[in-house]
């Protein structure tokens, strides 16, 4: 059985985690499923990205939320990620949806221009 089908079979409906560790395990499982689904996404959506670019994009999204520790927030993020991945793997999304996801760069920190720094210092 291919890893794509294996990744599809491991997706489950959203459940409420009993503990924080269980919620974190769900997030790690989602990350593994995202990485396993990359060849399927490239093939079916005819993407021009290589695997390392897509892997880095998935990783940046997970790193963005690594400081979330509350069980309910982890469950919510895992549910959103699972449904998005399920829609993409089930070909419910169009190619433009998937391309837009990989084209947009994650916002890390707001860059402050010199004029904004001056105004911030002035009003402090």
Curated annotation (Swiss-Prot):
InterPro entries: NADH_Ub_cplx-1_asu_su-6
Protein known as: NADH dehydrogenase [ubiquinone] 1 alpha subcomplex subunit 6
Main location: mitochondrion
Family: Belongs to the complex I LYR family.
Lineage: Eukaryota, Amoebozoa, Evosea, Eumycetozoa, Dictyostelia
Role, per record: Accessory subunit of the mitochondrial membrane respiratory chain NADH dehydrogenase (Complex I), that is believed to be not involved in catalysis. Complex I functions in the transfer of electrons from NADH to the respiratory chain. The immediate electron acceptor for the enzyme is believed to be ubiquinone.
Keyword Transcription regulation: no
GO CC terms, sorted: mitochondrial inner membrane; mitochondrial membrane; mitochondrion; respiratory chain complex I
Record's bilayer topology term: Peripheral membrane protein
Compartment list: Mitochondrion inner membrane
Organism field: Dictyostelium discoideum
Keyword annotations: Electron transport, Membrane, Mitochondrion, Mitochondrion inner membrane, Respiratory chain, Transport
């Amino acid at each position: 059985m291919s890893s794509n089908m294996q990744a599809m079979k491991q997706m489950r409906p959203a459940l409420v985690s009993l503990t924080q560790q269980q919620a974190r395990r769900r997030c790690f499982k989602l990350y593994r499923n995202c990485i396993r689904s990359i060849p399927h996404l490239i093939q079916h959506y005819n993407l021009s990205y290589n695997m390392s670019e897509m892997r880095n994009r998935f990783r940046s999204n997970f790193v963005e939320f690594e400081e979330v520790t509350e069980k309910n927030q982890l469950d919510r993020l895992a549910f959103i990620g699972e449904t998005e991945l399920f829609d993409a793997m089930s070909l419910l999304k169009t190619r433009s949806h998937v391309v837009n996801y990989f084209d947009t760069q994650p916002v890390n920190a707001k860059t402050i221009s010199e004029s904004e720094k001056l105004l911030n210092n002035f009003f402090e």
